[in-house]
Amino acid sequence: MRRSDGHEETSEFLPMTHSRSVSAASQTSTDSSLSTESLFPREQKPFPNAMGGMALADDDKYRDLEDGEAEQSEPFLSSSKKAATGGGRARRIFWILVLLCLGGWLLAFVLFLTGGRANYQTASDALQAHGADSALGSTSTSSGKPVTLHQVLGGQWNPRYHAIGWVAGPNNEDGLLVEKGGDEKQGYLRVDDIRSRKGNNTGRESRVLMRKPIVHVDGQAIVPSNVWPSPDLKKVLLISEQQKNWRHSFTGKYWVLDVDSQTAQPLDPSAPDGRVQLALWSPASDAVVFVRDNNLYLRRLSSDSVVAITKDGGENLFYGVPDWVYEEEVISGNSVTWWSNDAKYIAFFRTNETSVPEFPVQYYISRPSGKKPLPGLENYPDVREIKYPKPGAPNPVVDLQFYDVEKNEVFSVQVADDFADDDRIIIEVLWASEGKILVRSTNRESDILKVYLIDTQSRTGKLVRSEDVAGLDGGWVEPSQSTRFVPADPNNGRPHDGYIDTVPYNGYDHLAYFSPLDNPNALMLTSGEWEVVDAPAAVDLQRGLVYFVGTKEAPTQRHVYRVQLDGSNLNPLTDTSKPGYYDVSFSHGTGYALLTYKGPSIPWQAIINTHGDEITYEDRIEDNAQLTKMVEAYALPTEVYQNVTVDGYTLQVVERRPPHFNPAKKYPVLFYLYGGPGSQTVDRKFTVDFQSYVASSLGYIVVTVDGRGTGFIGRKARCIVRGNLGFYEAHDQIATAKMWAAKSYVDETRMAIWGWSFGGFMTLKTLEQDAGRTFQYGMAVAPVTDWRFYDSIYTERYMHTPQHNPNGYDNSTITDMAALSESVRFLVMHGASDDNVHLQNTLVLIDKLDLSNVENYDVQFYPDSDHSIYFHNAHMMVYHRLSDWLVNAFNGEWHLIAKPVPDESMWERMKRSLRLLSP
């Protein structure tokens, strides 16, 4: 529950999320198609920054150091006879000194074991911090084994989730889904009625789409990695030999399977080996539009030939697929091609990158370009020249074009009041009815939104809505593709077409209904001091209901709600009487949904029926029984949720306490953060991650605070960071850390902070602003160190252009090396082939450190690794290094090496002592 009094709120074993920018898992399906990953039960991939195996940090390292100390005494022992020649008095003095040395060494050793290492051993008393809804099902975490890093990195603590590929039947039937698995009789790929899963006689019989998981074409075995059934369910589009490009994009060989005959043919029979970047079914199921070599093609199934829609695509000109920066920062997908609902038109982007500067990314071991070097050139790195616009540099020029399928004609529509070519970012395209299409665009700095309505039949367009968001609250427009078209239905009280969009309203993001399409004035569907999330989720056109996920109960929670299209009768579908974090996926007609409970207790999934006033549960499809067993067997950290107030802003905090937490002890504290604009790291999902390992196995407290700039705490707190990234965010981390340093159970001399990507930037910015007064240590992975080095679309959204805001860029850059030198020590790690946050960031930082004679840092590079740092076991090594480095920090090892001096041998010290004692 949301608390405003600042009191602690105990909870179940609640998780923390991982921001996309840390290292988002790649999607492999298009936004408008279905794939095997999105259709079928699957094991959720381990969270992006903790995959792979990894050895635990153990005590061997510290025993080795002790052994080294013993070795240093060997010269003294081997030289003892020489000392004995000085007579009996000298011998007595000698043995007294020996005993004193040995006694001192033993005392230091005992103190080291009982004191120095107590920080990661558990105490005897357990904090009773779990209620009836606990993931453990008990009120104690005192029993069980510690969480291991190997388990976390191997994904053993990840909940198992299923995704349902809802499809509309050929006659618009609701409740149909695509499933895979089973023998040849059942069919490998089939369409089932959700009502048939429980033996309901009203359900339709299954329809087999693919009998076997492998199909043969001219004797060649095709093993598809993704599938896309046609809307009429008579064909299936297959992809094989799929290869990843960037985060969302990929290429592969495409095939069309006929359901009746179970035979397949290449998508383009004239080029069966051609690698295709994108393929999309026509809503009429009679054609496929696809992209190859950055050109757009149409394959009508009635013919074996294809029609070239565009012909001049190439290295600098893209049709139908996004370039790197649009894929990463605007669309978050691999498709910028959209069929009209009546299949008469195709809208697509034309992206011109000619003026965009290139950035070279080098690969020293692998050759992602696929090019075989010429003889004698094998020892040179493979170089990918990426068109990467940095702040202030030319952006790609993106235009929206249209293809008339019947006339085989490409055209564009000029609209008055459009942004100039170098000042336009198209963030969403949405088809309406009768050839009309809505286009949402922003200016380059993403603080002015314009919505255009284009009529492709008359080839005219007009501006229908404009919002100056910067003038409203100093904020920005976040790209999204969640706007929903609502068709006219006079019988149901909708005389005109309309659409539902998310807009700023009284300081929070809420749902607004615009009807007719050219009406700039909205009917607000939601309001209040909370926000909707990626809304709406679905619209029930028959009953006039809008479904959405929101934070009405608390910023850290997600519940499912519905509201009438007139804004009345807003009610929750999920149980809001206790903390919860839900997600939902609706069937085509919204009569059914897959409800996913993600925490705080053990996650589960169920099919629900939404036809009545209250939901009914049709089928429980996942309860994560294996997680229940693991929770019972392992000692998970206690998570305490609370609010803190900094400069009048209420911020969400979660504190992970080690099992057997003893308030009489003094614990080291690790702060973990991401902190990017609009992000959220403190939430109520069940997660056992690297932070859980640190608390459970190492015995440290881990604190996360979502400071100003993060999401779901209101636009005032979010927008204040614009133009000066890092200042308020770091201030909030430091202010919260000072609160923790004052707690009786915290060792204020052992406090660290770490993060990845934006979190890496925030780690360095916090150390810079703090100058060693609160945090002694920091660990930054793949950090931005100067926002002039990051991509233009993301950076200018929050910082304006460098020409517009030079002082802001200067302030946000990591520049104060003297302040960094005040920390005890910090660690920086980076993938050498990072195409997202370029290695340039860390190299320039190192140069600044060198020029300032700063030496209190460690640095590690990982060859051929991108932003997620996976290449050749690198991900395992990253977390191994983080864990070991942190243990060394909190054990005081970095103090010992801070100012190294030659160590005089013990024998020389003894001789000097003897001379002083001699008469």
Swiss-Prot record:
<keyword id="KW-1133">Transmembrane helix</keyword>
<feature type="topological domain" description="Cytoplasmic">
    <location>
        <begin position="1"/>
        <end position="92"/>
    </location>
</feature>
<keyword id="KW-0720">Serine protease</keyword>
<dbReference type="InterPro" id="IPR001375">
    <property type="entry name" value="Peptidase_S9_cat"/>
</dbReference>
<dbReference type="InterPro" id="IPR029058">
    <property type="entry name" value="AB_hydrolase_fold"/>
</dbReference>
<feature type="active site" description="Charge relay system">
    <location>
        <position position="757"/>
    </location>
</feature>
<dbReference type="GO" id="GO:0006508">
    <property type="term" value="P:proteolysis"/>
</dbReference>
<feature type="glycosylation site" description="N-linked (GlcNAc...) asparagine">
    <location>
        <position position="352"/>
    </location>
</feature>
<keyword id="KW-0812">Transmembrane</keyword>
<keyword id="KW-0472">Membrane</keyword>
<dbReference type="GO" id="GO:0005886">
    <property type="term" value="C:plasma membrane"/>
</dbReference>
<feature type="glycosylation site" description="N-linked (GlcNAc...) asparagine">
    <location>
        <position position="200"/>
    </location>
</feature>
<keyword id="KW-0735">Signal-anchor</keyword>
<comment type="function">
    <text>Type IV dipeptidyl-peptidase which removes N-terminal dipeptides sequentially from polypeptides having unsubstituted N-termini provided that the penultimate residue is proline.</text>
</comment>
<protein>
    <recommendedName>
        <fullName>Probable dipeptidyl-aminopeptidase B</fullName>
        <ecNumber>3.4.14.5</ecNumber>
    </recommendedName>
</protein>
<dbReference type="GO" id="GO:0000329">
    <property type="term" value="C:fungal-type vacuole membrane"/>
</dbReference>
<dbReference type="GO" id="GO:0008239">
    <property type="term" value="F:dipeptidyl-peptidase activity"/>
</dbReference>
<keyword id="KW-0378">Hydrolase</keyword>
<keyword id="KW-0926">Vacuole</keyword>
<keyword id="KW-0645">Protease</keyword>
<feature type="glycosylation site" description="N-linked (GlcNAc...) asparagine">
    <location>
        <position position="643"/>
    </location>
</feature>
<dbReference type="InterPro" id="IPR050278">
    <property type="entry name" value="Serine_Prot_S9B/DPPIV"/>
</dbReference>
<feature type="active site" description="Charge relay system">
    <location>
        <position position="867"/>
    </location>
</feature>
<dbReference type="Pfam" id="PF00326">
    <property type="entry name" value="Peptidase_S9"/>
</dbReference>
<feature type="active site" description="Charge relay system">
    <location>
        <position position="834"/>
    </location>
</feature>
<feature type="compositionally biased region" description="Basic and acidic residues">
    <location>
        <begin position="1"/>
        <end position="10"/>
    </location>
</feature>
<dbReference type="GO" id="GO:0008236">
    <property type="term" value="F:serine-type peptidase activity"/>
</dbReference>
<feature type="glycosylation site" description="N-linked (GlcNAc...) asparagine">
    <location>
        <position position="811"/>
    </location>
</feature>
<dbReference type="GO" id="GO:0004177">
    <property type="term" value="F:aminopeptidase activity"/>
</dbReference>
<comment type="similarity">
    <text>Belongs to the peptidase S9B family.</text>
</comment>
<keyword id="KW-0325">Glycoprotein</keyword>
<dbReference type="Pfam" id="PF00930">
    <property type="entry name" value="DPPIV_N"/>
</dbReference>
<keyword id="KW-0031">Aminopeptidase</keyword>
<dbReference type="InterPro" id="IPR002469">
    <property type="entry name" value="Peptidase_S9B_N"/>
</dbReference>
<feature type="transmembrane region" description="Helical; Signal-anchor for type II membrane protein">
    <location>
        <begin position="93"/>
        <end position="113"/>
    </location>
</feature>
<feature type="topological domain" description="Vacuolar">
    <location>
        <begin position="114"/>
        <end position="919"/>
    </location>
</feature>
<feature type="region of interest" description="Disordered">
    <location>
        <begin position="1"/>
        <end position="53"/>
    </location>
</feature>
<feature type="compositionally biased region" description="Low complexity">
    <location>
        <begin position="21"/>
        <end position="38"/>
    </location>
</feature>
